Amino acid sequence: IHYSQNLWTWCANNKVAFFYASSAATYGDGEHGYDDVSIDNLRPLNGYGYSKHFFDQWALRQVAENKPMPSAWAGFKFFNVYGPNEYHKERMASVAFHSFNQFKETGTVKLFKSHKEGFDDGMQLRDFVYVKDAAAAVVHFLTAALSGKPCSNGLYNIGTGKARAFKDLATN
């Protein structure tokens, strides 16, 4: 997170806007909801989520302590972004991408096994957001900042607001 902190500090010192990719992974299993009102209660499930979470906490501390801030700033908590041309991501490509290719090759989609009581295989929920919709949200913030009328600073969820089961994705 040190590089991100250095970028923030440079932007603050030079009155430049700072927009960064956080992640919905900061919410962990969703037990504490999907907002940042109680950010210190969030428990990411992996190192990636924690790295994003630590920087989000650090940014909010800068604000709370009235430290220098960029001219405008936002952390975008992207949910499950999918879209064309994900080939270069290999195994890190979206579930939607892998499911589509699996269906194209075999005519079926193998659903994730559930390891949680009460969830059948494939019934795990995710908020799938198309890459062009995610990009439009970021462009909105950039355009507002460039126009001199930036949006409110803070952390923003970038998703549809509706979770879908993997099974639903695979059958529709």
Locations of the language-model features?
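Residue(s) in the substrate-gating loop at a strand-loop-helix junction
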Residues: 23
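Residue-level detector of conserved, well-ordered beta-strand and adjacent loop positions
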Residues: 35, 112, 159
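Mid/C-terminal beta-alpha module of Rossmann-like enzyme folds, strongest
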Residues: 140, 144-172
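Catalytic helix-loop patch of NAD(P)-dependent Rossmann-fold dehydrogenases
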Residues: 2-6, 13, 17, 26-75, ...
